[in-house]
């Protein structure tokens, strides 16, 4: 205690000590506060990369082998990396300027500093890194677009024209980042990086356009990105019609030859064949000594024969080395590259961006990219009018808010509008380019060797050209080179002309005289399996019912009504279910546009004719039989029916005449198709509107059957045949409405709807009429067995043990031979409408059995007179119907 008193002897020392403790506490609290992590606001978006100090992390390179999931995860995590690095750098903080500069620089996302990068292994096994300067060409603007394409110059030129024409009427310009893709396998990597760049490094970005083939390749990745990515329409839509037209118009003095089409993908092949179809041009492939090769793409195929003629169609920019590899006298069909010069663009003065000076563009690439861009700019201008203020004639960017919200609507293809070529050239101020937008045909001449230099020179002679805008075809050196007039040569398209192309639906236009390459097979569609299953099950059920009826008839059973009609209806259903076979078969080649011989055409027409003939006849058989039965029921019914009676002969005449009418029309159609096969095509009838004319008579029979529904639905005759026919007719009418509606959606739908509709109609008759009727027949046979097993009403034994005390007869409405009814009931019910039980037939064994039974009952007490039945006193009047005739004389309808 004395020591402490010595320490605080002086007040000055105490004050200094307290001050020292206070300063230490402040420093300690400051250090703790600095070390505690705090949540910082996310970095703001910037429009352009900002310069930072050199103390940055190493440049990350994106490997080609990295997975898509890792790159997509990078998009999620990249926005938080800047914040985390900023916090960690400030924890090591100090008061010097260099540390604060590093912290500020970390707010900029790294991709905004480094740009896009690719790291991949080349053909020599070396690791190659390509930076943004090699990949991306940029036109600066306030609102940015990106394009991933194999032809970036054409995309840059279109955006330059948009800014020069000021389509958006604003005080700012649209910028573009054009990314060159020379390898499709690298497109996925570039797309993911570009989405990340636009999200983090630009303030206003509309989306990304990508080549059509690349879009199809990356469609699943694009859906996962959930970003505005749109396909550029394929340039082949502009090129292939020009190729087909020039081939069709080309003079061709040779005989018909085999044509082999070499393409990189099946889609290219099908698109070109569709274009050739529009020109009525048949390109045939068969075994031949002379071959014509049409080569699509920029890769050379080396299997050409020496006597073959080669037509090369480059789908990208044509390289000189590709032309050198082609055989001499080959024909090259390609579009003309346009050198960009300001004076050649538009009468009004315009300028070009620096990146476009000295470059060339392709007409097809300009047109396919300009159409969606012009439509997008029109939507953007409409959005600016709603969300921006206008100063004189321009919309001010500073006053805009949410002006890019329209993109969600524009990305829907239904809202877009197409523009024709002349309109695009006028809007984008490049009207003078119309004379230079040509698709040309050249012929490679024999290479000559320069005597002085010793170098070989290749000469391309222009044969013809077609303008993209006017579609005018011009011929050049053909007359002089071939020493003959152009008009004296037969055109290529006339030599390879299509046959049997009458009508709007030309399904098989490519015909030739050669060996067939087509074969028979069952269709691979899902509906075929469904239809075959329904047809087999329906056939089994129909045969089972038919066998049952035939067996019961052979046993001597007597049915209500004539069973001949039921048997004919069952035979018609067998035809209905078997008719699915020609609809399930097809005669095809290996490809969609397989070449067809003239014999193949006759086979296809025969198959089509069989389908039409069977379809119309089986419907007619079923509807005619049902109609004649409905007419009979309506003619004898007491509840609103006709008063006359239609007997079996008239029914047969009605049915036969109804069938003969349809047979006559169907046979006439087959004769006409055979005699006029060049002008009448069964395919065009089957897939055209004439089909409804062929089915009009069947539909008339169905409508007549439905019109008799009010007159027959109460009929109880023939196992309640009236209500069963009503159910079947209504089901068939519903089925017809469904399959006719489905067949309107196209040829593929019609292929499935017609046979499935036939099977459904057969099942409607089976389920609605025949199966319930079979059940009633079985139940009636069992009741008949029970009734005939009882003792006879005339036997003495039965008479001795029974007294008639009931007011109503026990056997009333059981058999006409033993029916008692009141006079009042007779006035309200027609005898023809009273339901009866079928009588068992007179088979030998059954007749002997019941005869013995009656004889035994009669011999029990033969000397005792039969008692007289006592009538009930409460019954005022009782009447008996005359005895029923013998079962062998019963009249049925």
UniProtKB/Swiss-Prot annotation:
Domain of life of the organism encoding this protein: Eukaryota
Keyword flag Lipoprotein: no
Record-level GO BP terms: visual perception
Entry membrane topology: Multi-pass membrane protein
Major site of localization recorded for this protein: membrane
Statement: the UniProt record of this protein carries the keyword Glycosyltransferase: no
Location(s), subcellular: Cell membrane
Extracellular side: 32-530
UniProt keyword list: Cell membrane, G-protein coupled receptor, Glycoprotein, Membrane, Receptor, Sensory transduction, Signal, Transducer, Transmembrane, Transmembrane helix, Vision
Glycosylated sites: 183, 307, 328, 471, 482
Residue ranges the record marks as coiled coil: none
Stretches assigned to the Cytoplasmic side: 773-893
Extent of the signal sequence: 1-30
Record's GO cellular component terms: plasma membrane
Regions that span the bilayer: 531-551, 563-583, 607-627, 630-650, 653-673, 692-712, 722-742, 752-772
Region (Disordered): 36-66, 82-102, 858-893
GO molecular-function term, one example from the UniProt record: sevenless binding
UniProt cross-references to InterPro entries, sorted A to Z: Bride_of_7less, GPCR_3_C, mGluR
Matching PANTHER family: METABOTROPIC GLUTAMATE RECEPTOR
UniProt similarity note: Belongs to the G-protein coupled receptor 3 family.
Name of the protein in question: Protein bride of sevenless
Lineage summary: Eukaryota, Metazoa, Ecdysozoa, Arthropoda, Hexapoda
Gene label: boss
């Amino acid at each position: 205690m004395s020591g402490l008193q010595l320490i605080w002897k002086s007040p000055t020392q105490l004050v200094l000590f307290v001050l020292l403790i206070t300063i230490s506490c402040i420093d300690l609290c400051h250090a703790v506060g600095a070390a505690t992590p705090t949540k910082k606001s996310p970095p703001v978006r910037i429009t352009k990369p900002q310069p930072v100090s050199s103390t940055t992390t190493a440049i990350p390179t994106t490997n080609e082998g990295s997975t898509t999931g890792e790159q997509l995860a990078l998009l999620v995590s990249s926005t938080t990396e800047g914040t985390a690095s900023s916090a960690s750098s400030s924890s090591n903080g100090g008061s010097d300027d260099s540390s604060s500069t590093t912290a500020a620089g970390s707010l900029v996302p790294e991709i905004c500093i480094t740009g896009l990068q690719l790291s991949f292994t080349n053909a020599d096994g070396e690791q190659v890194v390509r930076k943004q300067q090699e990949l991306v060409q940029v036109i600066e603007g306030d609102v940015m677009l990106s394009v991933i394409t194999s032809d970036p110059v054409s995309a840059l030129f279109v955006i330059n024209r948009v800014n020069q024409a000021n389509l958006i009427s604003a005080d700012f310009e649209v910028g573009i980042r054009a990314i060159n893709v020379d390898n499709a396998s690298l497109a996925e990597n570039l797309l993911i990086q570009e989405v990340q760049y636009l999200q983090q490094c630009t303030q206003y970005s509309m989306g990304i356009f990508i080549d059509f083939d690349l879009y199809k390749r990356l469609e699943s990745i694009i859906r996962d990105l959930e970003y505005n990515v749109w396909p550029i329409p394929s340039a082949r839509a502009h090129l292939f019609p020009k190729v087909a037209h020039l081939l069709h118009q080309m003079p061709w003095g040779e005989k018909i030859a085999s044509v082999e089409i070499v393409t990189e993908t099946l889609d290219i092949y099908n698109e070109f064949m569709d274009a050739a179809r529009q020109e009525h041009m048949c390109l045939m492939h068969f075994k031949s000594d002379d071959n014509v090769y049409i080569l699509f793409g920029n890769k050379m195929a080396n299997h050409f024969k020496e006597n073959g003629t080669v037509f090369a169609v480059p789908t990208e920019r044509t390289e000189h080395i590709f032309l050198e590899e082609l055989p001499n006298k080959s024909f090259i069909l390609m579009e003309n590259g346009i050198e960009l010069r300001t004076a050649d663009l538009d009468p009004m003065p315009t300028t070009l961006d620096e990146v476009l000076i000295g470059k060339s563009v392709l007409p097809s690439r300009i047109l396919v990219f300009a159409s969606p861009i012009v439509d997008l700019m029109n939507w953007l201008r409409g959005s600016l009018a709603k969300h921006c203020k206008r100063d004189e004639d321009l919309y001010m960017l500073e006053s805009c808010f949410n002006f890019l919200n329209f993109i969600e609507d524009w990305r829907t293809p239904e809202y877009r509008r197409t523009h024709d070529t002349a309109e695009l050239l006028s809007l984008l101020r490049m009207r003078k380019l119309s004379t230079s937008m040509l698709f040309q045909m050249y012929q490679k001449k024999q290479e000559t060797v320069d005597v002085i230099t010793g170098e070989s020179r290749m000469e391309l002679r222009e044969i013809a050209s077609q303008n993209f805008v006017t579609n005018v075809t011009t011929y050049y050196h053909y007359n002089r080179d071939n020493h003959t007039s152009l008009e004296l040569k037969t055109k290529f398209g006339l030599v390879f002309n299509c046959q049997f192309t009458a009508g709007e639906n030309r399904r098989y236009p490519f015909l030739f005289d050669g060996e067939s390459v087509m074969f028979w097979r069952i269709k691979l569609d899902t509906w075929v399996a469904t239809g075959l299953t329904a047809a087999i099950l329906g056939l089994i059920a129909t045969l089972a019912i038919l066998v049952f009826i035939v067996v019961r008839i052979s046993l001597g059973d007597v049915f209500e009504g004539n069973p001949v009609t039921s048997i004919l209806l069952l035979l018609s259903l067998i035809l209905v279910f078997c008719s699915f076979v020609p609809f399930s078969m097809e005669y095809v080649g290996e490809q969609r546009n397989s070449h067809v011989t003239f014999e193949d055409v006759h086979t296809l027409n025969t198959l089509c004719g069989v389908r039409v003939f069977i379809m119309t006849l089986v419907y007619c058989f079923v509807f005619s039989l049902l109609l004649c039965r409905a007419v009979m029921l309506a003619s004898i019914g007491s509840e609103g029916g006709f008063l006359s009676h239609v007997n079996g002969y008239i029914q047969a005449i009605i049915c036969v005449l109804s069938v003969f009418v349809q047979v006559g029309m169907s046979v006439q159609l087959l004769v006409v198709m055979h005699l006029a096969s060049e002008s009448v095509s069964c395919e065009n009838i089957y897939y055209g509107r004439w089909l409804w004319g062929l089915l009009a008579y069947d539909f008339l029979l169905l409508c007549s059957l439905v019109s008799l529904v009010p007159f027959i639905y109460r009929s109880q005759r023939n196992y309640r045949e009236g209500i069963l026919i009503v159910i079947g007719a209504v089901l068939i009418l519903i089925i017809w409405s469904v399959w006719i509606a489905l067949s309107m959606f196209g040829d593929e739908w019609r292929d499935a709807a017609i046979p499935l509709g036939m099977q459904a109609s057969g099942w409607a008759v089976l389920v609605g009429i025949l199966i319930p009727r079979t059940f009633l027949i079985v139940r009636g046979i069992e009741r008949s067995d029970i009734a005939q097993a009882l003792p006879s009403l005339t036997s003495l034994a039965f008479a001795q043990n029974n007294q008639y005390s009931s007011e109503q007869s026990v056997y009333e409405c059981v058999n006409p031979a033993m029916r008692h009814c009141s006079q009042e009931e007779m006035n309200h019910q027609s005898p023809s409408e009273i339901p009866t039980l079928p009588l068992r037939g007179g088979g030998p064994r059954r007749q002997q059995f019941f005869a013995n039974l009656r004889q035994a009952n009669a011999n029990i007490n033969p000397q005792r007179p039969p008692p007289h039945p006592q009538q009930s006193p409460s019954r005022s009047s009782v009447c008996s119907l005359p005895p029923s005739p013998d079962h062998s004389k019963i009249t049925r309808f």
